[in-house]
Structure formats: C-alpha cells, structure tokens
C-alpha cells in the first residue's frame, strides 16, 4: 500500500481539478461551464478559444445526435422492417426498420467521445487554475507560441504519443468495448435476432458456463482441450528445442552452422503453405497413408485427421515440427551468453554434466526465458493457424458446434463467422481474455524474472 501511495504522488499535479473547483476564483469556477473562460480572462486568447470550440462542438454533437445515440443505446430500438403493398406499383415495398447493431455502435462511440470531452474539460480546469495561481504569484504566463514550442521540447512525449494512443483507442479499445457490450445482448442468428436484438443481461454467460445445454458442455470440453494443448505445445517445444540447442552447441559437435540451417528450414517456409501441405499428406488417401500401405506396414489408412485421439496427437506433433526451430534459435543465443566462469568453477568443484545442467544451465535458462514461456503459452491458447489449417477442428460430432481439436479461438471463429452466434462468441472471447490475463499475471508475479529483476543469482 505504501508503494502505491508513493507511486500515486509521482503523478500529482500542483494544479489539481479539485483545488480549481474549491479554491479557484469566480472566473476559474465559471470555466466549469464555459470552457476556456479562465484562459481568456488572463489573455491566453487562442488557448481559450480552442477550449471553447471543443465545448461548442461537443454540445452541437450531443444535440444533433449524441443524446439520441445514448437513448438508443439503452433501448436498442425495436421497429422491425415491414412489408407494405404499393397499390400504384402493384408490388410489395419494405419500410426501413431499426438497425440495432448501429445503435449499439453509435452509443458506445458517443460514450467514448463523452469521456474524451471530460478529459479535455479536466485539462481546461487545470489550465484555468494554473494561470490564476501564476497571475496571483506574479509569475510569467505562457503565450501560445511558448505552449507550441513546449510540445516539441518539454512536452514532446505528448506530441509523440497522442496519435498512437488515439489509434489504440479507436482501433483496439473501442472494438473491444463494443464486443463486450455484444455479450450482453441477444445478437444472434437464433430467434432471428441479427437485425433487431435487445439486452439480456448475464443470460449468455449462464448459457456458456452452464452444463445444462449443448453450448455450455461444448465450452468446458473445448476449454479442457485448449489448456492441455497449450501446456503440451509450450513445454514440449521448449524442452525439445533446448535439448536440440544444447546438443548442437556442444564443443564436440562439428559443422554446427549446417545443423542449425537444416533445422531452420522448416521455419523459413510459411506456416500457411506447410500446414496445408501436411494436411493433404495426412488424409486417408494422402501420401503418407499410401506409402505405408504400399510398404505393407498397415492394411488400412491411419485416421490421422478423422479420429479424435489421432487428430489431437497429430496436431501436437506437427506443432513440434513448426515450433522447435524457433525455440532452438532462442535458446542458442542464451546458451552462448551464459558466463563461462560458472561452468569452469563447477568443473573445478567436481560437478558432472548432469549436475551442471540442473544447477547452472537450466536455472539460468528459466530465469531468462520465463517471460518468453508465458508469452508462448498465451500464444498457443490463441494458436489459430495450426489447428484451423491442419484439421479445421475436425473430427466434428454430428450436430456439434465444435470439433474435437477445436481450441477456444477456432470455436470462436466458427460461432461468429459460420453460425452467426455473435453474442455467445463475444462471451467466449471475454472468458478467453480473463483466463489468459489471470494465468499470465499470477505466473509472472511468482517467477524469478519478476522477483529478482536485478539479475540472475
């Protein structure tokens, strides 16, 4: 708690909004309602006009459509498209109905615009209180030229970060909030709610997390396989890649560059190409089964992609072929940076190769690569390419929404793109994020990389 208070003090400003409201003069307090008034009163004309222009623009936006957007965000509309007979033309015509998805989008966007306005309003209050205090103390009040010069000097970070942050808000945070809102609606092909839908509260979460329906049972089944897949894909790649790197890195190994080149060949081929090619080769009538049959090793094709157990084993093995070269190269770089003095001291003390590995090499590797392991684990939970391109989630039981090799991310794709269960898909997306965030944060905070940031000991 003390550390949090200390960090909070670092962000304190000498001109907070609370003091501007409680201790400011009449002009500063009026700036709450007429933005820029405090700046105008102290001859910061351009700055005051800009604040006032922002307020006028926001008020016009709210009058023209913002208030209506917020109202429709609550109601989500309800007027469906109607079929009306046109006597003159002798045909049926359709009257325009409500597009609920647009009401939801515009409502969320209006909230974001309102939050942005409130942030600018806070800057306005701080600025008004600052110029008031500086005027009372007889200090210099900046001109617009000095403020602009500060944007490329003392406040350069504002200039550089404004556009990236704005881009993140518009293209990342806004769609995420929109998706989260969708999870609380009936937006789905079920019941013909693709055009007109309404708020349903936590019903979708109950559907996904409950065991009394097909969606709920599928979720827990897919979640279990996703976690098993992530653990196997992460640690098998890591362990085998490390062993391969250690073997190649030994002093007795010759032509090391050649062996590294051979193992990196699979990484140079685009995954899209190699996985689709492997999928074709592993089919019942594919190259591998044909070769095995012709060699007399099997009498019937092996169900690489049609049997649940075989398919799961296949994707894990193929993922090793794809992922081990990357791990090998990462580990190779780290191995070459382990201080040689540690090994020399261990040998002097009589330690053998196994002891050196478990006492020096492995602890050092884990210390350096734990963040990489966590990132790889989360990446494997969201590993869309390997699963979808290799098996497309197959085999799929009759009537099921997910196959035996589907991960949460591939199931989410099917729910939204193929089945148009957008509300359920949004819930799955939220739950996936929560699982990843909790596992990653708890794991990282309990690692040596976090607790001993000063270095390996």
List each language-model region with its residue ranges:
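A structural signal for multi-pass alpha-helical bundles of membrane permease subunits
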Residues: 65-73, 125, 156-457
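Acidic-enriched, low-complexity/disordered segments with a strong bias for Aspartate over Glutamate
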Residues: 25, 82-86, 98, 142, ...
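Helix-loop-helix
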Residues: 72, 76, 90-93, 140, ...
């Amino acid at each position: 708690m003390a550390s949090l208070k200390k960090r909070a003090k670092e962000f304190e400003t000498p001109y907070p909004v609370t003091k501007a409201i409680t201790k400011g003069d009449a002009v500063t307090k009026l700036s709450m309602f007429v933005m820029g008034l405090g700046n105008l009163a102290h001859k910061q004309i351009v700055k005051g006009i800009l604040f006032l222009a922002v307020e006028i623009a926001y008020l016009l936006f709210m009058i023209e459509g913002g208030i209506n957007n917020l109202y429709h965000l609550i109601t989500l509309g309800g007027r469906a498209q109607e079929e009306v007979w046109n006597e003159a033309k002798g045909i049926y015509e359709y009257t325009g109905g409500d597009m609920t998805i647009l009401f939801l989008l515009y409502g969320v966007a209006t909230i974001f615009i309102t939050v942005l306005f409130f942030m600018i309003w806070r800057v306005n209050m701080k600025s008004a209180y600052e110029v008031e205090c500086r005027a009372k103390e007889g200090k210099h009040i900046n001109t617009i030229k000095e403020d602009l010069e500060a944007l490329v000097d003392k406040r350069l970070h504002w200039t550089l970060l404004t556009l990236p942050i704005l881009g993140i808000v518009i293209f990342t945070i806004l769609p995420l909030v929109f998706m989260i809102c969708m999870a609380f609606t009936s937006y789905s092909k079920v019941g013909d709610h693709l055009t007109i839908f309404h708020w349903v509260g936590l019903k979708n979460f109950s559907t996904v997390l409950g065991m009394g329906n097909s969606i709920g049972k599928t979720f827990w089944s897919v979640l279990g396989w996703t976690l098993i897949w992530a653990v196997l894909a992460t640690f098998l790649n890591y362990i085998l890649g490390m062993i391969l790197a250690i073997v190649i890195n030994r002093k007795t190994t010759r032509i090391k560059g050649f062996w590294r080149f051979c193992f990196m060949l699979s990484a140079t081929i685009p995954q899209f190409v190699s996985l689709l090619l492997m999928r074709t080769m592993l089919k019942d009538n594919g190259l591998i089964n044909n070769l095995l049959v012709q060699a007399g090793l099997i009498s019937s094709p092996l169900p690489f992609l049609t049997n649940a157990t075989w398919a799961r084993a296949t994707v894990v093995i193929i993922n090793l072929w794809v992922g081990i070269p990357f791990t090998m190269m990462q580990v190779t770089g780290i191995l070459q940076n382990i201080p040689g003095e540690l090994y020399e001291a261990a040998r002097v003390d009589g330690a053998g190769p196994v002891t050196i590995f478990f006492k020096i090499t492995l602890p050092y590797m884990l210390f350096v690569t734990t963040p990489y392991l966590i990132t790889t684990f989360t990446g494997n939970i969201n590993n869309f390419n390997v699963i979808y391109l290799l098996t497309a989630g197959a085999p799929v039981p009759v009537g099921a929404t997910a196959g035996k090799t589907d991960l949460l991310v591939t199931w989410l794709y099917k729910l939204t793109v193929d089945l148009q269960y957008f509300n359920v898909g949004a819930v799955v997306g939220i739950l996936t994020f929560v699982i990843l965030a909790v596992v990653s944060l708890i794991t990282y905070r309990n690692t040596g990389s976090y607790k001993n940031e000063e270095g390996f000991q």
